[in-house]
Regions:
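Hydrophobic/aromatic beta-strand elements that line small-molecule binding cavities or substrate pockets
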Residues: 114-116, 120-130, 139, 248-255, ...
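Bacterial N-terminal signal peptides
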Residues: 10-18
Length: 376
């Protein structure tokens, strides 16, 4: 497939900010078009509160006209609680138009000035990597299209995005403790009964956060709400902020007939040298809406995932071994000035072969990851 001119995320390295600098001057939408928030801080200078993030909307897409098989299966009568939980998780798979909105709603410090809100978007296919009785893994792949300067469609850009794993009644979790450190935590059998742990991984498959919660199935929607957890700053924040150290918050995933929604309720937290909370700057609300679409060309993402699936499967396995064997992990952002995601994306690109040597690849991945592990 080398003849194809589809671009992959290794070429742009913007990832969590969803190509903001790449598209900010796109002709798809006027930069002067109003962009609104409900919690808009109306007495603040409008220039200061102009949303940052991607201002383009990309190529037009068509929303799915019906709820589809996944929704029908989820709402079927006679299911056990666990069966319905599983169908709710699997309902997040498929083709979506995604929008991302984040805004600070409350400030807690003297002289507080609200930060500019964040908006962006994407077209994502969520692939089912694993579907087992007690474990489901979902991989997000972005396939983005923009109009070129002459109005013709440009080649799609492919970005391996985040991954979410779901395990039933999981008792071991590595939780974030600030300072790029994750520590093993355990739940009792009683605490884990009937609950699912969602593990969220970065684009390079390194851990981001893990949280336990319980699915609830209402008359016409299903939702999962997490316990409060710590998580590192996402790229949309650490690329522009250095005045706080961790997010403390909860997530809620809600499945609807037209797709699903992820809500975040975060506290932007300053930590002291010992990793304890010293100050909370603000509360942030976030909403990511995934609307099911139809008729979109996902071939670039399909082919990328097919070419690199073996490499990423080995990467997941190497990380799983670290998480199984180590009580504490400290992961550096960079090694010799190179971010981990950049190194891993380059390895994935160079490993696209039909006869991948799994043992050699495993050793190479382990050696690469070791460069980013802090032994101190």
């Amino acid at each position: 497939m080398a003849a194809k001119k589809w671009r992959t995320g290794v070429m742009v390295m913007v990832l969590g900010t969803v190509f903001a600098s790449r598209v900010v001057m796109s002709d798809d939408i006027s930069v002067n078009e109003p962009r609104q928030f409900t919690f808009s801080w109306p007495y603040t200078d409008k220039t200061d509160m102009a949303p940052r993030g991607g201002s383009s909307r990309g190529a037009p897409v068509g929303l799915a006209k019906s709820a589809g098989e996944q929704w029908t299966r989820l709402r079927a009568p006679g299911l056990t609680d666990k069966e319905r939980d599983r169908f709710a998780i699997l309902a997040m798979a498929g083709p979506y138009r995604a929008s991302f909105d984040f805004i600070e709603t409350i400030g807690f410090v003297e002289g507080y000035i609200p930060a500019a809100p964040y908006q962006s978007w994407g077209t994502e296919f969520v692939y089912v990597v694993t579907d087992e009785s007690d474990f489901i893994s979902l991989q997000h792949i972005m396939v983005l299209r923009f109009d070129s300067s002459d109005g013709t469609p440009a080649e799609p850009m492919v970005i391996k995005h985040w991954r979410q794993d779901w395990r039933y009644e999981q008792r071991r979790m590595h939780t974030f403790h600030g300072n790029l450190t994750w520590k093993l935590a355990k739940q009792s059998r009683a605490e884990s009964r009937g609950r699912w742990v969602q593990s969220v991984y970065q684009v390079d498959d390194s851990p981001r956060y893990m949280a336990a919660g319980r699915w609830q199935h209402r008359a016409n929607f299903s939702s999962w709400t997490s316990d409060e957890t710590w998580r590192p700053l996402p790229r949309r924040e650490f690329s522009v902020r250095n005045d706080y150290d961790a997010l403390i918050g909860t997530n809620r995933h809600t499945i609807t007939p037209s797709g699903w929604v992820q809500e975040e309720f975060n506290l932007k937290t300053v930590l002291d040298d010992e990793g304890a909370v010293s100050e909370i700057l603000a509360r942030e609300n976030g909403v990511a809406r995934y609307e099911r679409i139809s008729g979109y060309d996902w071939r670039a993402g399909d082919e990328y995932w097919k070419r690199t699936a073996d490499f990423w499967a080995i990467t997941r396995d190497v990380w799983a071994n670290y998480l199984q064997d180590e009580h504490t992990l400290r992961i550096r952002k960079t090694a010799e000035g190179i971010p981990l995601y950049a190194a891993m994306f380059e390895m994935a690109e160079s490993s696209q072969t039909a006869n991948l040597d799994s043992n050699a690849t495993r050793d190479a991945i382990r050696q690469m990851l070791q460069r980013y592990m802090d032994e101190s």
